[in-house]
Amino acid sequence: MANQVIRITLKAYDHQLIDQSAKKIIETAKKTGAQVSGPVPLPTKKEVVTILRAVHKYKDSREQFEQRTHKRLIDVLSPSQKTVDALSKLEMPAGVFINLKVMN
């Protein structure tokens, strides 16, 4: 596992929650002796939905809602088996989606 890289992608709607999770992942990886690159903030996806307030007429009266998806990228360089076990057993708060990918 010396030349491998673990690429961790985090997604969440709350930017504070994703930053706390990234910090926890970095601390865990550094405790096991691996080198860490990141967190790299990726572009935020903004989804806007417009709905009519009234049912029949009053088309000028509309309401907009938005949902922002924040993303972070963390690379763990030269991980050991101990690092992989620690990262897979790490508990994250609800609302944070984690994708672990092992690359050569």
Curated annotation (Swiss-Prot):
Gene3D superfamilies the UniProt entry points to: Ribosomal protein S10 domain
An example molecular function term from Gene Ontology annotations: tRNA binding
InterPro entries: Ribosomal_uS10, Ribosomal_uS10_CS, Ribosomal_uS10_dom, Ribosomal_uS10_dom_sf
Keywords: Ribonucleoprotein, Ribosomal protein
GO CC term (a single one): ribonucleoprotein complex
Methyltransferase recorded as keyword: no
Family annotation (Pfam families): Ribosomal_S10
GO BP terms: translation
Entry-linked PROSITE patterns: RIBOSOMAL_S10 (PS00361)
Quaternary assembly: Part of the 30S ribosomal subunit.
Family (UniProt): Belongs to the universal ribosomal protein uS10 family.
Role played: Involved in the binding of tRNA to the ribosomes.
PANTHER family: 30S RIBOSOMAL PROTEIN S10 FAMILY MEMBER
Identification of the protein by name: Small ribosomal subunit protein uS10
Species for this entry: Lachnospira eligens (strain ATCC 27750 / DSM 3376 / VPI C15-48 / C15-B4) (Eubacterium eligens)
